[in-house]
């Protein structure tokens, strides 16, 4: 599948095209079982070709060959977000690339880090008791649509975080399985 996406990008990409890649490979420090090392290498290569990437913390660690457990062991420390910032800065493959690290758990909050070569910021949201299937897809869709429509990346991330925060708060109140989306 990664080869098909590469072919699509190479066929249709123009100078004005924005390519966003959500390098889905794992979560909670673990690689998804369907992913081989070869597939991960291809996804990492795909991410390097993108204008914007939206990895979660596990995927950022895979992209940068960083030890997730070691990094995450600092999650209660005051410098945790700064440590993530340092790792994210090492992930840039070209000067115009932008990185949004999603779903960084710290205390009772989730943070999303927005990184460019020149700047970094974090958007904070309340955590509503765990993960919800599909939120990463919704997040990337809102960010991409907003950026394509001329919004700054930080503004786009704030919009996505606001929507998902409301949606997960409402969903957490319902008696449904979180994997049902």
For the regions a protein language model found, what residue spans apply to each?
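Glycine/small-residue-rich loop that forms an oxyanion/phosphate-binding "nest" at active or ligand-binding sites
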Residues: 1-45
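Glycine-rich beta-alpha junction loops
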Residues: 25, 59, 103-107, 126-129, ...
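Conserved phosphate/ATP/ADP-binding segment of small-molecule kinases
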Residues: 33-120
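Short, small-residue alpha-helix embedded
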Residues: 62, 129-153, 157
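Hydrophobic residues at beta-strand termini and immediately following loops
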Residues: 123
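Charged C-terminal helix
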Residues: 154-181
């Amino acid at each position: 599948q990664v080869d098909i996406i590469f072919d699509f990008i190479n066929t249709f990409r123009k100078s004005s095209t924005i390519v966003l890649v959500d390098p889905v490979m794992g979560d909670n420090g673990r690689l998804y079982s369907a992913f081989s090392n070869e597939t991960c290498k291809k996804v990492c290569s795909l991410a390097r070709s993108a204008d914007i990437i939206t990895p979660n913390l596990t995927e950022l660690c895979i992209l940068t060959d960083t030890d997730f457990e070691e990094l995450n062991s600092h999650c209660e420390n005051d410098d945790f977000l700064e440590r993530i910032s340092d790792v994210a800065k090492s992930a840039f493959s070209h000067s115009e690339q932008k990185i949004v690290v999603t779903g960084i758990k710290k205390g009772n909050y989730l943070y999303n880090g927005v990184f460019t070569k020149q700047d970094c910021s974090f958007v904070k949201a309340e955590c509503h008791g765990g993960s919800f299937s599909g939120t990463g897809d919704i997040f990337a869709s809102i960010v991409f649509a907003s950026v394509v429509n001329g919004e700054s990346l930080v503004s786009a991330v704030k919009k996505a975080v606001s929507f998902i925060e409301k949606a997960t708060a409402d969903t957490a109140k319902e008696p449904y399985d979180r994997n049902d989306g």
